[in-house]
């Protein structure tokens, strides 16, 4: 499982089947403190992987470092830096001969390991053209252009997908889509 920024009631049934929880970074939509505490108490067999900032606040079993592989059973995870406004990691791993990449809340994929990948779970937050249209406006109560620049655009996500996919059957699952600017 990756991240736990939701109430425990939304994920409890799934927790009986998992062995590893990866927490990408310290934002409340990625780690809900109550949910995490409940997982630690009620599901002690689940081992948590997170970066040192996540560890300092919440405590994890395995502290991830960019570029250093982490082995959990048959799976080897490779964390990489995913630039955001806090320390954030994306991850690459293989299962059943298929290579998977997961990255969200980042503005560039420049630190991602090279493909090819079979599965892409990556941020596809906004359409660059829509953001350009609101560049100098605060119509939504905040600087939407500045906020968007902290997130990967749909164009950048698709560019990464097309240049790093194994073949035309590689799957692209878009994450963190903006309801206003996608």
PLM-predicted stretches and their roles:
Residues 4-6, 26, 53, 82-83, ...:
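Active-site metal-binding loops of divalent metal-dependent hydrolases
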Residues 1-3, 18-21, 44-53, 62-63, ...:
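Short, hydrophobic beta-strand segments that form beta-sheet elements in well-ordered domains
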